[in-house]
Amino acid sequence: MVKVENKETLRLLTSRFMKMNRARNIIAVIAIMLTSLLFTSLFVGSVSMILSKRATEIKQFMDSAHASAQNLSEEDAKRLQETIEQSEQVERYGSGIFLGAGMDERFGFSVEVRYADENMAESFNCLPTTGRLPEKENEVALSSMILENLGVRPKIGEEITLTWEVNPMLKQYKTDTFQICGFWQGDKAVLGQMVWVSEAYAKENCYPVTEEELENGIYNGGKEYSVWYKNLWNLEKKTETISKAAGFTKAGTGMEVNPAYNLLEEDSFSFSSLIVMILFVILAGYLIIYNI
């Protein structure tokens, strides 16, 4: 390529060229601008659609963590927690225990009684906006929708009596009176409404589920974990590595990636479709500019 030292001459030649083909050059500039605008709009629109779909799935399925493990026995939970804590890929994690379903005809929706630490409650998008999570054995934090349906004032210190299912196979139930220590605005669009109890209450009253019972569909007393990695790269590989290191070798066991973050799932936005659209825009822009 010839290097032109005289910039004034270059500007003069460019100016004359523009004046000689003014109409065509103006159309070419407009075509370039429109192509750039279309490309930018396509990219921004695609990213917005992906993020919007992700936010919707996170809200609907009540899971904002990158990966999670559910329905674990005491032994499996202990082994997995040790592995998570040793992993350099993990930024933070949350833990919880599923006690059972809330039982009351006045609910009209699904209610789950659980223990959750702050990270786990955050992954469910059910952190108290008023008050705090339970610390004492007789404390409870719950959705405002539950309080409304039971006719209890949403006020810290109010007492509430709840019945929950200890074991669905044995038809075993437990009823206790709690003191409200926190609550948040319930959302009708989510899968269920949460009731958080303290760790002390959960360990004292949860069903001692066995691994065999978990395999047969009894999840009461099952332990669970939510994990956030330091970044979103290779979520499948990171999750698989932790699961295998914790001793989970069977398919469907151990940790699983949150589908909301897996953009290659069948029901998620297809990257191949995005690439095809981008190539189409580039080709169309090139042909328009070339023909001018």
Give, region by region, the residue ranges found by the protein language model.
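Basic-flanked hydrophobic alpha-helices used for secretion and membrane insertion
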Residues: 47-265
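Hydrophobic alpha-helical transmembrane segments of multi-pass inner-membrane transport and secretion
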Residues: 20-51, 266-292
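Short, membrane-interfacial amphipathic segments enriched in basic
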Residues: 1-12
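Generic anion/oxyanion-binding catalytic loop in active/binding sites
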Residues: 3, 38, 136
